[in-house]
Amino acid sequence: MPMKIVLRLFDWASSQVNRQRIILLVGSLALFLSARSSWYQLPPDTLEAFGVSLTIANYYRLIPILFGLLGLFFTIWQVKAKTIRLLFWSGLFIVLLFPYFQSNWTPSVTFLANNYYSQSARVDRNVERNFSDIQAQWKQNISLDEPNTPDASLNALIKNSSFLQVSSLEKFLKDVLSYDVSFFWYISLNWAIAILGFAISLFGMYLDQSHRAMNLLNRDIGNLLPWLAVVLSLLCISILVPNIIHYQLNLSYAKGDYRVVQSMSKTLATLYPPLQGDEFFLERLARAGYYNEQPDISLVALARGLENYRQKNWIKAETHFQESLNLKPKNFLVRGYLASAILNQGISNFNDPSNRNAATAADTFERVLTVFPNHMEAMYDLMLARAVNGEFDKSANIAIKIIENQKYSQRPRSALLGQAYLHLAWKGFKDHNYQKAWQRYRQSVDDSVWKTVIEEEP
């Protein structure tokens, strides 16, 4: 008797299994898998130093969890309703807008992503340009590149009317929706898995409709297009309105109406956070407050620092930036400029042809890392300076940190990683550990062995 019950249950379960249910189950599992960790990844000590939170990236993970539960429910109890399909389409579009919300509502994250990407790119160019000297260990002949000004967190200021033309679609995707390579460099694979999970789930929902599937798909897309147009229009308005007000404030500033500029700028920065990382906007606000006799001391110090920075007076610039940062520790733009001003001092010491001072330069690069942890150019420059100064153990420690930080990016920088492994090879050679030195040297020229684990002695 029990055997018959088991067989009947098995037959019933077999009859319930079909392609649609299997695909819905796979889609649900993919959605659950995408929520295993944060959708954006940056070094934790950098986030702490800048006072940055990945709240949006963490809360966004609730979306695939909810839709994964819905998918499991529909896997067991099949529901054929247009509302369900449109609900999953909406979930997919919300997930696709993750870069927009992450970039626009946490501009400090955009600032860090832009700067880490550009710093790594400049280091790569320096390595490629000096490759022959680097491989030959002629560090004394290498000059370090001056860093560019910190990249802003605001990319969507409209420069002219071409923004409204069809040809500006790429700019809309890159600057408004934040579909930019610098942002994607540090995005987690979980975001792509979530998109895949929604796509699989939607495929499963249309699968059992046989010859009606394409008709239903066309009808659903037709129902979604008006709503999609509304969403895109709202996104455009969210960019156009701040730009219109921004340029209107330029006119008010030119007329000397500083009170209006000061009050409206503060309101605009609250409603449109990316402006908090735009140096022109903040400098204008500082000057308006100063002339209105209601100065924001932190912004005035920032403006003075920017003026000295443009004149390449790095020490005075550092003083003003430090004063501004002391008053507003979470001002990420000030922190970025402060790090750049200190870095330029170290590079000047290192590049001085008549009196190269690698030890002083190294100490200066260390100061950069206390302001801007994991600053790629500062770590690379510090690694070189320590090697030039004969401090191969300290150089190797920085190399290890560079290697560890590459795990946060989607695609490690080959030139930078190659140099880090080369410095570890030199440490092994100086320690007379020739086997380890050879293994590290192989890693510096062959990316296929990067994942080989080699323990370093303390």
Label the predicted regions.
Residues 68-84, 196-229:
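Cytosolic-side transmembrane helix boundary signature
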Residues 90-100, 216-244:
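Internal/C-terminal transmembrane anchor helices
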Residues 101-114, 234-259:
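Hydrophobic alpha-helical transmembrane segments in integral membrane proteins
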Residues 250, 275, 297, 306, 331, 340, 347, 375, ...:
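Residue-level recognition of tetratricopeptide repeat
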Residues 284, 303, 337, 344, ...:
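Canonical tetratricopeptide repeat
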